[in-house]
């Protein structure tokens, strides 16, 4: 294992640990408010922290989340550096790194923008989806292509694995995007206040959290290329 491969794995591990810890602690704090248990299927990313106003602890969630996304995006940088060492197409690799950084920043913005500013929140949610789609398209079209030296010609199994994983991620994204319930959003949720009624399954929140999961899983194709 090369140093860059080790750094790639370390960045993913540290980033995931930070995300898990912040979700556990913030989720427990949310439950103590007496509202209900925090659920990824019902509550938005910004709601994990919105109840701690004018508190020093309110800065923990955005700071740790920013650090986590920064470290996760660093994995794409290590992939770009490994590609450069192997004589691959570094331009695409660095573009993927840049897209990952932008995606992380947009998610961090979603942890601040409340539904009281509904249009801005929706703009960032759409941008979050589009950046994830761009990352997957780059993986699908460039990583399995031997002309860009990401995968050596004899490694057909690696090419197939990258294609299948990326295609499955695209299907997951399509399921999140093309949910018929979005058409009934105004009937299901009152959006003119920060405190509102909502269904058991909040599909816009699911779209945001689902794309956060995709943001993490986008590391799988480049991980396959780096190690196989």
Language model feature labels by segment:
Residues 8-14, 60-67, 96-102, 124-131, ...:
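Physicochemical signature of membrane-embedded alpha-helices that form the seven-helix bundle of GPCRs
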Residues 140-228:
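Terminal transmembrane helical module of multi-pass membrane proteins
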Residues 76-99:
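Cytoplasmic juxtamembrane regions at transmembrane-helix boundaries
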Residues 25-50, 225-227:
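Hydrophobic transmembrane helix segments
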Residues 4-33:
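N-terminal signal-anchor transmembrane alpha helix
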Residues 47-70:
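Interfacial helix-start motif at the membrane-water boundary
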Residues 97-162:
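Membrane-proximal helix-loop-helix units in multi-pass membrane proteins
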């Amino acid at each position: 294992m090369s140093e860059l491969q080790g750094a790639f794995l370390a960045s993913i591990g540290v980033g995931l640990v930070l995300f898990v810890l912040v979700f556990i602690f913030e989720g427990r704090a949310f439950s103590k408010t007496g509202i209900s248990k925090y659920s990824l299927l019902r509550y938005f990313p910004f709601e994990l922290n919105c109840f701690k106003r004018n508190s020093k602890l309110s800065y923990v969630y955005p700071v740790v989340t920013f650090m986590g996304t920064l470290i996760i995006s660093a994995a794409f940088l290590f992939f770009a550096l490994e590609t450069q060492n192997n004589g691959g197409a570094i331009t695409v690799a660095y573009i993927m790194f840049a897209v990952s950084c932008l995606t992380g920043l947009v998610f961090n913005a979603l942890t601040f923008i409340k539904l009281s500013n509904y249009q801005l929140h929706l703009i960032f949610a759409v941008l979050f989806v589009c950046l994830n789609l761009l990352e997957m398209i780059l993986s699908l079209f460039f990583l399995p292509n031997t002309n860009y030296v990401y995968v050596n010609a004899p490694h057909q199994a690696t090419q197939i694995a990258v294609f299948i994983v990326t295609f499955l991620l695209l299907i997951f994204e399509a399921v999140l995007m093309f949910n018929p319930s979005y058409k009934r959003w105004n009937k299901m949720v009152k959006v003119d206040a920060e405190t509102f009624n909502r269904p058991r399954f909040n599909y816009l929140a699911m779209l945001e959290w689902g794309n956060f999961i995709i943001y993490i899983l986008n590391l799988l194709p480049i991980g396959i290329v780096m190690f196989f």
